[in-house]
Design a protein with these regions (language model features):
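Structural signature of Gram-negative outer-membrane beta-barrels, strongest in the C-terminal barrel
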Residues: 1-36, 236
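Gram-negative outer-membrane beta-barrel transporters
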Residues: 23, 31-36, 50-184
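Conserved C-terminal beta-signal and adjacent last beta-strands/turns
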Residues: 4-6, 10, 86, 104-112, ...
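Flexible glycine-rich, low-complexity coil/linker segments exposed to the extracellular/periplasmic environment
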Residues: 1, 45-79, 189-218
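Switch/connector loops and helix/strand junctions flanking conserved nucleotide-binding motifs
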Residues: 39-43
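Short, mixed-charge, low-aromatic patches
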Residues: 27, 64-65, 223-228
Length: 274
């Protein structure tokens, strides 16, 4: 593969301030960030010849594979996407609320806003509009300005209530929808009828219980929140037990096609310190 080295520029400006308000004590951190890439390296999912691992990017590639008695597989290949800009802001605070010397509430809250932009998306769309081969792979699932597999918003909160040797905690995480995925997985461009790639997707990813990969993703690529709980007790200085429930409400969500997150999970953990 002819991959150029990725070059970039990064700048970040922010401030961190301590605070004490009554029994609250902690820090607040605010930062803005900007990153610019040239020849940014991204991976692209596609169909590959199982014999020589070359990407199938045309009908002639597919015919040659079949006539040579070879098969195909799904894989990913790194390549340059030219220019990209990623910028945004991050706000966080962490600290403790002191009820008394034996009882405390620890907290950590954070929010990130990101603009992950493909700076060359217009030129790429113009070039892809000229494609005539129905098997020629496009960069992503839509014609938007955003890079693949990235959300715009994310929020996370961690709270731990501690009383003597007992700890009760919770995690809350929220993310907005993913802005774009690979073209091999789905095509969000408006069209009047199915094309060859739609049939290829059906063969590659299957069809189950009335769902295709695209219909499942469209249904589940939405903003989602998850909640985790934990209860711990320190039996001695050396031994501690913790019981955790991850994904408390058994939220069904997917952070990328073909990757369904874990359902509700129960974990019992013992820590021993020597």
């Amino acid at each position: 593969l002819d991959i150029k080295p990725e070059k970039g520029f990064n700048a970040e400006l922010g401030f961190k301030q301590g605070y004490k308000i009554g029994n609250f004590q902690g820090f607040v951190d605010v930062a803005g960030f900007y990153t610019q890439y040239k020849d940014m390296v991204e991976f692209q999912f596609g169909l590959f010849n199982n014999a020589d691992y070359t990407m199938i990017n045309s009908i002639s590639d597919a015919i040659r594979m079949i006539t040579d008695g070879q098969g195909f597989g799904i894989g990913a290949q790194f390549h340059n996407v030219s220019k990209a800009q990623i910028y945004g802001v991050e706000i966080s605070t962490n600290g403790v609320y002191n009820f008394n010397k034996n009882t405390k509430l620890f907290y950590n809250l954070g929010y990130v806003y990101t603009e992950p932009r493909d700076a060359d998306y217009k030129e790429r769309n113009d070039a892809e509009d000229l494609y005539t081969d129905p098997l020629q792979m496009k960069e992503k699932s839509n014609t938007g300005k955003y890079l693949k597999y990235r959300p715009k918003h994310s929020f996370k909160a961690t709270v731990d209530f501690q009383w003597k040797r007992i700890n009760l905690g919770a995690n809350v995480a929220w993310k907005s929808k993913i802005l774009a995925v690979d073209y091999l997985m789905m095509d969000e461009r408006p069209k009047a009828q199915l094309d060859l790639m739609d049939y290829v997707r059906g063969i590659a990813f299957g069809y189950s219980k009335g769902e295709t990969l695209a219909t499942y993703w469209n249904k589940h690529n939405t903003p989602y929140a998850t909640v985790d709980l934990r209860f711990g007790v320190k039996v001695t200085k050396e031994v501690a037990f913790q019981f955790m429930v991850n994904n408390l409400f058994n939220k069904e969500y997917s952070y990328r096609p073909m990757a369904v997150a874990a359902p509700r999970t129960f974990v019992l953990k013992m820590d021993v310190t020597f």
